[in-house]
Amino acid sequence: MSKKIRLIARLDVKDTNLVKGIQLEGLRKLGDPNACAKEYYEAGIDELLYIDIVASLYNRNNLSDIVRKTVDDVYIPVCVGGGLRSVEDVRHILSMGADKAAINTAAIKRPELITEVAEAFGSQCMVLSIQAKRSRTWPGKWEAYYDNGRAHSGYDVVEWAKRGVALGAGEILLTSVDNEGLQQGMDLELIEAVTKAVNVPVICGGGVGCGDDIVDAANAGADAVACAAVLHYKKETVTELKEDIRAGGVEVRQV
């Protein structure tokens, strides 16, 4: 085994509820995000990713209390995104116990924020979140979206990823909106295009339905894979996913 992958549990939050949709739409309430975070941590997940999915629409982030409670119970990296619009917003969420900040909407609207966050807290803290959809006007390319996949940016995903890294992003969170929630496999062409274009770790999400999907993503270049529906709906456990990943010839942290 030579290729390694990190397994991340993605927890989308609306108000105080863990939610899940398909292609970022049709949200369904699933329960207490803190309880799920603790469950996945105890099962051996490598990292947690919290996203306040409506924060950018309402100019606020409601994750402070959730993050603060989570870090009392878990001892793995926690990344937080949604509604982070300034260095002060990032400072606050880090003070609650987060290790990294994922920024999408505010970075598209004001790209220099990427540099400001990287200079204030280190590039390892600045995660550029990219919501990618296959473009109808640019054959073979993807467009970056924001406001939870609702708004066009006009940015080519690969070029935006390269620009974000040049501005100081130390990691990319790449979500395929087209595949998100379907549990039918990931957009491997997208993963390969972005990972070949940048020299920082890329967390890939959207479409995981089994361990083989994660193996495919790793072989396409992903450094980490964010899982949601496959875990939330109990299709596979963290242990089962990791067993499948190892069986596919990819290294993952032992539980």
Put a short name on every predicted segment:
Residues 47-65, 105, 173-185:
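Glycine-rich, proline-tolerant flexible connector loops at the mouths of alpha/beta enzymes
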Residues 74, 78-100, 189-225:
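Catalytic cores of alpha/beta
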Residues 61-68, 111, 154-158, 184-192:
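Charged helix-capping and loop-helix junction motifs
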Residues 114-121, 215-255:
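C-terminal helical cap(s) of enzyme catalytic domains, especially alpha/beta-barrels
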Residues 12, 40, 48, 80, ...:
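Conserved, mostly hydrophobic/aromatic
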Residues 13-15, 19-20, 24, 98-174, ...:
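Conserved anion-binding
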Residues 54, 62-125, 247-248:
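Glycine/small-residue-rich loop that forms an oxyanion/phosphate-binding "nest" at active or ligand-binding sites
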Residues 6-10, 47, 75-79, 99-102, ...:
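Structural preference for beta-strand elements that scaffold enzyme active sites
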